[in-house]
Regions:
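Absolute protein N-terminus
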Residues: 1-2
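Flexible, gly/pro- and Lys/Arg-enriched active-site loops
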Residues: 5-68, 119-207
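Intrinsic disorder/low-complexity segments
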Residues: 65-120, 131
Length: 207
């Protein structure tokens, strides 16, 4: 199942200068509860905005052609270096001994790279990422705007936090969704000592 999760203002604003506009503790708590143990897919800017990098206890997928090409280039260099070392060693090996060829090659038909240092999988596109997910995998699309736009036609469900406010400044917006989705459940929350605006947890399914 593909689920889009986001916090949106009345005008569908979601961010400003690559940062969230609203800081809602209950929204963050809900986000953690829904996504923990599952796969999250995000764009490069969303990944870079995470204070501590990859989110724990989740499979983190980052969509980025530049990161993918960079990782591809680094791995090719490592492969070529390993091959060169093997070729050089061949001149000094006694006859009859076999030298194992480098086993670290980039799969020609696989476009994914796992970066263990960052605990992320990198794909050049959403299509490629979804192709490398299991059919029964619970997938959460967490942003940003361009990834939301790409994922919206493919999504099965929307889990939105709708905030009863229109921010003064915003440069990133969630795509229009009202015409194709119907409300499945709603949980309204008033202003309190930790939340400056009324908000609602709203789940949508396709009409």
């Amino acid at each position: 199942m593909i689920t889009i999760i986001a916090a949106v203002a009345k005008n569908r604003a979601i961010g400003f200068k690559n940062k969230l506009i609203y800081w809602l503790p209950n929204d963050l708590k809900r986000f953690k509860a829904l996504t923990t143990g599952h796969t999250i897919i995000m764009g490069r800017n969303t990944y870079l905005s995470l204070p501590k990098g990859a989110l724990p206890n989740r499979r983190n997928i980052v969509l980025s052609k530049s990161m993918w090409k960079e990782e591809c280039g680094m791995r090719k260099e490592n492969t070529h270096a390993a091959d060169s070392a093997t070729d050089s060693a061949a001149f000094s090996v006694p006859e009859g001994n076999l030298i194992p060829h480098s086993t670290f090659h980039i799969p020609q038909k696989d476009s994914t790279f796992h970066i263990p240092q960052k605990n992320i999988d990198v794909f050049p596109s959403l299509e490629e990422a979804l192709a490398h997910c299991a059919p029964d995998e619970d997938i959460y699309i967490i942003g940003g705007a361009s990834v939301y736009r790409q994922a919206l036609p493919l999504a099965d469900r929307l889990c939105l936090t709708e905030i009863d406010d229109t921010p003064a400044e915003a440069d990133t917006f969630f795509p229009p969704y009202e015409d194709d989705w119907q409300e499945e459940s709603r949980e309204d929350h008033p202003v309190d000592d930790r939340h400056d605006f009324p908000y609602a947890f709203v789940d949508y399914i396709r009409k």
